[in-house]
Each structure stands twice: as structure tokens, then as C-alpha cells.
């Protein structure tokens, strides 16, 4: 049986390779700078991007720079000894023990206290990072076990760090007020600006109530809301559940911290 002969046109069509359909380029993620900006203006973009990369070095670096500058300005404008003396107003028992010392010992204690206050203040970023690790651990375990969330510890820590960015705005406000010449009589690093009811209270009158009132802070509530939104974005847990978990842990930490502060004040 004679074989079929292909025409030149048919041969060219048979030999021509099939044109490949171009694949769309993968969408690039947010830069670290864009993440920081979007945390304030479009937080869902930032937290959704954490599923791609859980890097949190940029907001931590911002915190280190701002807090270090704040501590330096406060040390120059107010002085660490004065700051330590103001802090002792919230510790009536410690204040009474200091006043019972002989004058030379009291002076020595105040000098040493000022130096210790400076060291602790400059170590604030390290202390904060440890606190973030504790908070991230508590939230990660709760979302994983209680809510069945599909979230890693690394992403949980990144959410906590990015959500804390509004607290840096509070630090900036405090730094500006100190630089502008705020009265040093009642300044403290723990509650430097009037963003909570505790700022208007006398700590020694009721240490527990003062601590609780200080925790009800505008910037802290903003941070808590961002944390809840973050876990909703990365884990698909219902927003109401996320808010209940985040604010529940905040209430626990606040009450326990206030109770310990009152017990050892």
C-alpha cells in the first residue's frame, strides 16, 4: 500500500513546535518598608504577607532606634536619678525604706539607683524582645490548641512585633514632650504621656488600680486590635475569636502584673 505523501505546507505545520502560553509572573511580596507603612494604613496587607515571609527585623530595628533616642534625650533633659526617684513614688514601701536610711547611705542608694535605671533603660529593646517572645508563645499555643489555627510560632512572633508599631508612636510623642521641656516632677518611662487614665492618677494611692488604668492605653488598644487582625489574616480564624483570645490574654497579663506590682511595691 503506497505511503501518503505530505505536502510542504503540511510538513512545516507538523514540524512547527506548539507555542507555549506564557505563565504569569509570581506576585512579589511587600518590602520591609511597605510592611511598616501598611501596618498603619492597610494592616491586612502586612499580616497576609507574613505567610510568605515572617521576617520581623525591620520593625524591631525601628524600635531599637526610637527607644534608644528617647532614653538618651530623657537622660539629658531630666536625668536618670530624677527618673528613678519619680518611679519610686509608685513604690511606697521602697520609698519608706529609703527614707529610713542614714543620709550618706541614702545618697549612695540614689546614685546607684540612677546608674541602674540608665542601664535598664538602654536595655529596653532586649527586655521588650523577651516580653514579645512570651506573648507570642502564649498566643501561638492558644490559637493552635483552642482555635485549631494553622499558624507557626515564627509567624506568631512576627504578628506580635509588627502589631507593636503603634507603641513606637507613643514613644515618639513622649520623646517630643521631653525635648519640648516637660516638667520632670512626675515623668516616668512606664507612663510618659497622657494616653491612659493612669497618667492622671497618683501611683502611691492605689498601685494596683494605677497599673490597671495605665494598661487601658489608646496605643495599647490599637496594638491589641492589630494583633487580633493579624491572627485572623494568617490563620483564617474568625475575627471575633481572635479578638477574644488577644484581649483575654491582655486582661490576664494586666491583672497579674498589677497584682505583683502591688504586692512588691
Predicted regions mapped to residue ranges:
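A generic alpha-helix surface/boundary motif
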Residues: 41, 136-140, 224-226
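Short alpha-helical transmembrane interface motifs in multi-pass membrane proteins
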Residues: 29, 120-125, 209-214
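Short, membrane-interfacial amphipathic segments enriched in basic
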Residues: 23-41, 112
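Low-complexity, intrinsically disordered extramembrane tails and loops of integral membrane proteins
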Residues: 1-30
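Hydrophobic alpha-helical transmembrane segments and adjacent short intramembrane/lumenal linkers
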Residues: 154-265
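Selected alpha-helical membrane-embedding segments in polytopic membrane proteins
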Residues: 32, 45-169
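Hydrophobic, aromatic-rich membrane-embedded alpha-helical segments
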Residues: 35-42, 46, 217-220
